[in-house]
């Protein structure tokens, strides 16, 4: 699933293609998954922002003054395999027809992606978006608050994946951050030192992943690529994710893979020992 670095890279790549353009029509094949998109017809794209793993297209009437705020948001969630392309393909689910005559295609082989038009800030229909925590690279994500929350957390990796303590961290970047912080993925109730290490690791890993355009894990049709076919580069910096059985880059112990919270989870059993409460 595309996580924050992949979605942020997508935003940066497609914003120049859409900003200032009018959406003439949105054509799709599943009204239950792509909801209220007709509300975007005839509206101009003012800009694109991102919240966690969600893209938000800011739309306004085509004749609205430049200083008028946008009055509609088109929320795009890439799901497991969604992404934008410049050419239609067998997995195209949504077509954005622009007033310029150009088209942008949303491809999604596994059909978990969503496109929903809402009033600005009206995220009641998307509870994960409405309740998610601060952006990991923003000033709103503070070490003091994170340490306080982590002191009473359950198993730390599922806690991160809930999006409540911090937004945009998924399977890949949770595993990588926990390796950098030397924390077992099932560790509970982090002490201040552990939580501080994890806080700093999240910021460092996410910044590096954004800088390298995210992670591309293969060449299959569902693997992450940008609209121009370019992949990410952070997969070459993975220390644990996808490396089960390979030696840890820090100590040489084979990386293990377990299932935790129904998610495949990679860690080093030596560098990331599970602490007992007695050793807190």
Curated annotation (Swiss-Prot):
The active site is at residues 2-3, 53, 263. DNA binds at residues 91, 110, 152. Its cofactor is Zn(2+). One of its GO terms (molecular function) is DNA-(apurinic or apyrimidinic site) endonuclease activity. PROSITE patterns: FPG_CAT (PS51068), ZF_FPG_1 (PS01242), ZF_FPG_2 (PS51066). The keyword Zinc applies. Keywords: DNA damage, DNA repair, DNA-binding, Glycosidase, Hydrolase, Lyase, Metal-binding, Multifunctional enzyme, Zinc, Zinc-finger. GO terms for biological process: base-excision repair. Its EC number is 3.2.2.23, 4.2.99.18. InterPro entries: DNA_glyclase/AP_lyase_DNA-bd, DNA_glyclase_Znf_dom_DNA_BS, Formamido-pyr_DNA_Glyclase, FPG_cat, MutM-like_N-ter, Ribosomal_uS13-like_H2TH, Znf_DNA_glyclase/AP_lyase, Znf_FPG/IleRS. Pfam families: Fapy_DNA_glyco, H2TH, zf-FPG_IleRS. It comes from the Bacteria. SUPFAM superfamilies: Glucocorticoid receptor-like (DNA-binding domain), N-terminal domain of MutM-like DNA repair proteins, S13-like H2TH domain. It catalyses: Hydrolysis of DNA containing ring-opened 7-methylguanine residues, releasing 2,6-diamino-4-hydroxy-5-(N-methyl)formamidopyrimidine; 2'-deoxyribonucleotide-(2'-deoxyribose 5'-phosphate)-2'-deoxyribonucleotide-DNA = a 3'-end 2'-deoxyribonucleotide-(2,3-dehydro-2,3-deoxyribose 5'-phosphate)-DNA + a 5'-end 5'-phospho-2'-deoxyribonucleoside-DNA + H(+). Binds 1 zinc ion per subunit. Monomer. Belongs to the FPG family. HAMAP family: Fapy_DNA_glycosyl. This is Formamidopyrimidine-DNA glycosylase. The lineage of its organism: Bacteria, Thermotogati, Deinococcota, Deinococci, Deinococcales.
């Amino acid at each position: 699933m595309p996580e924050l670095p992949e979605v942020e890279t997508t935003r940066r790549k497609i914003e120049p293609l859409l900003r200032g353009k009018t959406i003439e029509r949105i054509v799709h094949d599943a009204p239950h998954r792509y909801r209220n998109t007709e509300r975007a017809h005839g509206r101009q794209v003012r800009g694109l922002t991102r919240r966690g793993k969600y893209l938000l297209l800011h739309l306004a009437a085509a004749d609205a003054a430049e200083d008028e705020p946008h009055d509609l948001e088109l929320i795009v969630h890439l799901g497991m395999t969604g992404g934008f392309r410049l050419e239609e393909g067998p997995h195209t689910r949504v077509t954005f027809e622009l007033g310029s005559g150009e088209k942008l295609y949303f491809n999604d082989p596994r059909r978990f992606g969503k496109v929903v038009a809402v009033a600005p800030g009206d995220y009641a229909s998307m509870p994960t978006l409405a309740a998610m925590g601060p952006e990991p690279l923003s000033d709103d994500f503070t070490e003091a608050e994170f340490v306080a929350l982590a002191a009473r957390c359950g198993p730390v990796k599922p806690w991160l994946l809930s999006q409540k303590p911090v937004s945009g961290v998924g399977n890949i970047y949770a595993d990588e951050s926990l390796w950098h912080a030397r924390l077992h993925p099932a560790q509970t109730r982090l002490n201040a030192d552990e939580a501080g290490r994890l806080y700093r690791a999240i910021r460092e890993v996410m910044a590096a992943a954004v800088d390298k355009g995210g992670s591309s894990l293969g060449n299959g049709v569902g693997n992450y690529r940008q609209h121009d076919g370019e992949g990410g580069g952070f997969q070459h910096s993975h220390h644990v994710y996808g490396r089960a059985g390979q030696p840890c880059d820090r100590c040489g112990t084979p990386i293990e893979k377990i299932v935790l919270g129904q998610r495949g989870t990679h860690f080093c059993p030596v560098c990331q020992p599970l602490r007992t409460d007695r050793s807190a």
